[in-house]
Amino acid sequence: TTSRGKFSAAAGENFPRDVVELRSLLGPLQVGQRVQAVPGTGLEVPLWILGSSLFGARLAAHLGLPYAFASHFAPQALRDALDLYRVEFQPSGQLKEPYAMAGVNVFAAPSDAEAKRLFTSVQQQFAALVRGTPGQLPPPIDDIESYWSPAEKAHACAMLEYSFVGDPETVGQGLRRFVEQTGVDEVMAVSAIHDHGARLASYRLLAESMM
């Protein structure tokens, strides 16, 4: 446990081996197995690979695992990663066919205008990343255009490409189009909304929009 909790420069290189080891620890106890996960052994917990690059896509494909892509903040490689994953997928005991999920940002509110205002929190946060001043999620503002420079806006909007912002109809239509275009099996909705009540309401409206 201690060694697995430490980060080192070799962590990335060792990651594939660590995933295989974890899968074995969650499987049936083998004869001669020196380390046993308690609890864990025999639970067959489904493993996913979450990534934002082609490395994770290839690893998930070669291990026959479901793959989730972090396109809610790193959208550029989404299509290439999904294509690579599907082409190189090798069936496993957990999964017989490719199974993919994509992360998207969802900001749903009763009106498009209200949803766009809620969205300014994460827009400010990503602009702060561009400035090199990351921090906590700020409250929404009325005029995002006065907050960022054209360069900051371009960078933030590029990272937030897969964001669905609006009333339930707008969000629902956008998500259905996204699923149709990418062919993903699941969507992971991320809603970085400053007010907790508004965040819960956004998830409720999202659920209603997909019924």
Residue spans for each PLM region:
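Short aromatic-enriched loop/helix-cap "lid" or pocket-rim segments at secondary-structure transitions
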Residues: T1-S3, A61, S202
